[in-house]
Amino acid sequence: AANVFIGMVESPLFIRAYLAKLSRSELFTVMTAGMATVAGTVLALYAFVLGDVIPGAAGHLLTASLISAPAAIMVARLMVPETAAPTGGGELPPTPYESTMEALTQGTSDGLKLFLNIIAMLLVFVSLVALVNIVLSALTPGDRAPWTFEGMVGVILSPLAWLCGIPWAESSAAGALLGKKVVLNEFLAYLDLAAASEEALSDRTRLILTYALCGFANFGSLGIMLAGFGTLVPSRRNEVAELGLKSILAGLLATCCTGALVGLMSTAGLIG
């Protein structure tokens, strides 16, 4: 529930005392929920970007996050089924701090460490994407437009866009937006969505993509998540890294399920 309003790093703080005890499936569910939603702090920015092409953009984006939260749980449980006993709430462990001042200083130190780790991981993942694009550009034959990693991912995701209810004629452009969202981030994808011509994308397709793009499932967010969980629960750093790429896929599938639902409602005349 917290993921709908705050970020993927802040929301696990609500259950920090239980992070080390979560089963593998529960941990993956927490990761997927972070990938399938966006923080309330950026909703206003995205609504401003889409305001001219999507009537009531703010309401659609908030609804997208609300619907994608249960969708994330569904997809996560299907991809990593529960095999252990569910983690109960129980009693919180006693606080390790003996005074308010000790808690304040330790919290400040942990916060700074978390911030620096996030910055470092984000730089590394963005740099890796840039490096791949440089290599692909050098391998591009003839006078063709330079190949990019996000472009290739977009081609792969075109059938997924079609499964969301987007017409096949528009699936290539929609897949390109999904690819940009996964490789780079959803903000750049929303900018392209707002700039797309009416000939390229119909109003219904724009509405579906508004929901399908509304999530943090991208490589930069993976770096942020690895840094965040690595600081909050160091004992499970390797497990989080193993589940990282799978959580991006799960988050993308969750938002696409939301987009498909909106597409069905639009076809039935219930929305749009």
Regions found by a protein language model. Give the residues of each.
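Juxtamembrane inter-helical linkers in multi-pass membrane proteins
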Residues: A1-F14, A84-A103, F149-V153, L177, ...
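Alpha-helical membrane segments and immediately flanking helix-loop junctions
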Residues: A1-L50, A174-L261
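Loop-to-transmembrane-helix entry motif
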Residues: S25, G107, G111-L122, L243-G251
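Hydrophobic core segments of alpha-helical transmembrane domains in multi-pass membrane transport
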Residues: A36-F48, A64-V80, M121-I134, L157-L160, ...
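Alpha-helical transmembrane segments
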Residues: A57-V75, L207-G215
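Long, contiguous bundles of hydrophobic transmembrane helices that form the permeation core
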Residues: L66-L112
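Alpha-helical membrane-protein architecture signal
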Residues: Y97, M101-T105, V153, S171, ...
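Transmembrane helical segments that form the transport core of multi-pass membrane transport proteins
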Residues: S109-E198
